[in-house]
């Protein structure tokens, strides 16, 4: 999983305290370095921790969360350096995984108008310099409404769209311009000179921090008259200029995509921010769409929803279609489900292919035709093209009133996931450091909607025996796997999980639990030869680990002769045979001279349950 490094995960003392707090705005408000922290809030026992009269940022203060007594960092708190080093080592896989990825980020108008915007932009600048490519799409709805109110005018909405008269268009131009200038200014400063003076390149001390490029990166057209309503200068996305956006990203710039579009006749049109952002994410084949909002996605009990599969998000939106215009428009846009809706978890899940040249991506489909999103055209479902659905617009009175919570943002997330963007993150921007916590903390800090997590993974069935045998036979013949007869394989079938793609078994693995010892054996991880190098083995191992955790197991072990390196890279450590449960030791074929490896499982709080897949 890529949700992020688990910083400060042990029960020992730690200064990186955000990970020891409940995920609520009230707790995170205390992470301002100016505030004194109450040691009784910590969730660990620190025999050496004592309240101090003054608290300042430590020299290892990566995210402004570390605190220590002034002047006593090295003498009394040597654990700080250890935690700092540990954080970097644990974050390394995620730093590596995100580098070179393209994230489209929507920053809502409410967040831009609030006090948390500066910190979010600092984090974006930090991530940009780590090699993440950003397209920023700022919201302007609140700012436009405020400008109209100051001029004695009232905003008019019909459905998801604003009716843009001359006054509204002028306000939209002013709001977009002011926000663009502000974002460019906030992203321009480099890192603090005092922090880089020792090791930094002195010739770069006064360089501009982040280069921001903006311009006419998409073509628009008038929405026109719909159901008798003249929307004036309201625009819809016609086509994203993928080549120019990618050129700027390749050149090391952050692309700022405003909601002002330009028509073929030279008009300026006021477009919907979410429509622009979702259309851009689909067209350029973004790795993520990140929506920074002014609140969290909560369940009926008021708890944060950490994770939703595409099926679950789609189902939640569809259930509200009778009471929500935005949900109804989602159903209208993507269809009733017969064309591209995933089958139930026990059946075959379709295949999601990656974007090609940033212009076309496919999503889950049934039958012989895989629906395709094509920039500037729409979705081709095999029965003709869907016009005008370049992106998904949300807004209007429904979004402003929040009668349906953040259902509109969830609908947009499901829309782009169905179009091929594999991950969408819905984040509460009022939480300090939420972007870093979401990307570098294993369980995240927001709600992730994903189309690719455990795609096609399920428990094995009797009809899968032939497919499993086909995959493991070459590995048995080479001595990598222990030979199993058909009878042995059938008896162990309940312990197998498989990955199915287009009706074919492409990977398998087994988990044999030993409940008395609270551990389980991982066995028979195998991937079809033509599907290797696609991460299927990692997906299966992650699935096995989550399944083991759900069964109450605390450790996993395995026996291997030739694949030790693969498992060591995934957290397994060599152990003695005495660590293996007695009942399993009695059945070990010592003539194979296998090596034994063990891995302790970290309690999983990501919200991703294999029982839901």
Curated annotation (Swiss-Prot):
Enzyme class name: transferase
EC number: 2.3.1.1
Record function comment: N-acetylglutamate synthase involved in arginine biosynthesis.
Gene that this polypeptide is encoded by: NAGS2
Gene3D superfamilies according to UniProt: 3.40.630.30, Acetylglutamate kinase-like
Cellular compartment(s): Plastid, Chloroplast
Reactions mediated catalytically: L-glutamate + acetyl-CoA = N-acetyl-L-glutamate + CoA + H(+)
One Pfam family per UniProt: AA_kinase
Protein's GO biological process: L-arginine biosynthetic process
Keyword set, alphabetical order: Acyltransferase, Amino-acid biosynthesis, Arginine biosynthesis, Chloroplast, Plastid, Transferase, Transit peptide
The organelle targeting sequence, given as a residue range: 1-74
InterPro entries: AceGlu_kinase-like_sf, Acyl_CoA_acyltransferase, Asp/Glu/Uridylate_kinase, GNAT_dom, NAGS_kin, NH2A_AcTrfase
Record flagged with keyword Chloroplast: yes
Pathway(s) this gene product operates in, as recorded in its UniProt entry: Amino-acid biosynthesis; L-arginine biosynthesis; N(2)-acetyl-L-ornithine from L-glutamate: step 1/4
Residues spanning the membrane: none
SUPFAM superfamilies given in the database record: Acyl-CoA N-acyltransferases (Nat), Carbamate kinase-like
One cellular component (GO) term of this entry: chloroplast
Domain N-acetyltransferase: 455-603
Name of the protein described by the UniProt record: Probable amino-acid acetyltransferase NAGS2, chloroplastic
Native species: Arabidopsis thaliana
Similarity annotation: Belongs to the acetyltransferase family. ArgA subfamily.
HAMAP family (alphabetical): N_acetyl_glu_synth (MF_01105)
């Amino acid at each position: 999983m890529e949700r992020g490094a688990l910083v400060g995960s042990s029960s020992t003392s730690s200064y990186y305290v955000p990970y020891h707090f409940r995920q609520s705005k009230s707790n995170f408000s205390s992470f301002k370095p100016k505030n004194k922290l109450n040691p009784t809030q910590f969730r660990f026992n620190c025999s050496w921790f004592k309240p101090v009269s003054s608290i300042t940022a430590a020299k290892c203060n990566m995210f402004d969360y570390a605190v220590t007594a002034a002047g006593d960092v090295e003498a009394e708190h040597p654990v700080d350096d250890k935690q700092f080093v540990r954080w970097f080592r644990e974050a390394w896989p995620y730093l590596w995984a995100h580098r070179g990825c393209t994230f489209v980020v929507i920053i809502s108008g409410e967040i831009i108008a609030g006090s948390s915007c500066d910190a979010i932009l600092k984090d974006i600048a930090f991530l940009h310099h780590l090699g993440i490519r950003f397209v920023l799409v700022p919201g302007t709805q609140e700012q436009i409404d405020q400008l109209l109110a100051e001029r004695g005018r009232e905003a008019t909405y019909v459905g998801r769209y604003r009716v843009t008269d001359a006054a509204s268009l002028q306000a939209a131009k002013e709001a977009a311009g002011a926000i663009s200038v502000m974002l460019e200014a906030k992203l321009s400063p480099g890192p603090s000179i005092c922090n880089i003076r020792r090791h930094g390149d002195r010739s770069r001390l006064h360089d501009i921090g982040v280069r921001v490029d903006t311009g006419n990166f998409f073509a628009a057209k008038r929405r026109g008259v719909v159901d008798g309503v003249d929307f004036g200068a309201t625009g819809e996305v016609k086509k994203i200029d993928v080549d120019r956006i990618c050129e700027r990203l390749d050149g090391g710039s952050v692309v700022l995509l405003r909601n002002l579009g330009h028509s073929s006749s030279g008009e300026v049109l006021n477009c919907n921010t979410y429509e622009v952002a979702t259309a851009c994410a689909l067209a350029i084949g973004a790795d993520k769409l990140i929506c920074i909002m002014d609140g969290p996605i909560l369940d009926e009990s008021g708890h944060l929803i950490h994770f939703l599969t595409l099926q679950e998000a789609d189902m939640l939106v569809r259930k509200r279609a009778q009471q929500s215009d935005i949900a109804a428009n989602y159903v209208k846009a993507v269809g009733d489900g017969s064309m591209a809706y995933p089958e139930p978890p026990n059946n075959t899940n379709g295949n999601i292919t990656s974007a090609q040249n940033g212009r076309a991506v496919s999503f889950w489909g049934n039958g012989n035709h895989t629906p395709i999103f094509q920039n500037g055209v729409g979705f081709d479902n095999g029965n003709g093209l869907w016009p005008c659905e370049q992106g998904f617009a949300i807004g209007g009175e429904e979004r402003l009133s929040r009668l349906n919570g953040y259902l509109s943002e969830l609908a947009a997330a499901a829309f782009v996931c169905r179009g091929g963007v594999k991950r969408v993150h819905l984040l509460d921007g009022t939480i300090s450091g939420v972007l870093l916590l979401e990307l570098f903390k294993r369980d995240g800090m927001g709600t992730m909607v994903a189309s690719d997590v455990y795609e096609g993974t399920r428990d094995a069935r009797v009809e899968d025996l032939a497919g499993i045998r086909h995959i493991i036979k070459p590995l048995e013949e080479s001595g990598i796997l222990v030979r199993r007869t058909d009878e042995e394989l059938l008896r162990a079938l309940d312990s197998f999980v498989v990955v199915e793609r287009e009706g074919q078994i492409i990977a398998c693995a087994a988990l044999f639990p030993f409940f008395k010892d609270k551990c389980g054996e991982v066995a028979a991880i195998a991937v079809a030869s033509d599907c290797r190098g696609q991460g299927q083995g990692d997906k299966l191992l992650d699935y096995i680990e989550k399944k083991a955790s759900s069964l109450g197991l605390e450790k996993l072990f395995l026996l291997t002769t030739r694949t030790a390196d693969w498992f060591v890279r995934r957290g397994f450590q060599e152990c003695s045979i005495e660590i293996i449960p007695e009942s399993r030791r009695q059945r070990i074929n010592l003539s194979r001279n296998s090596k034994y490896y063990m891995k302790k499982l970290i309690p999983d709080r990501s919200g991703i349950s294999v029982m839901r897949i």
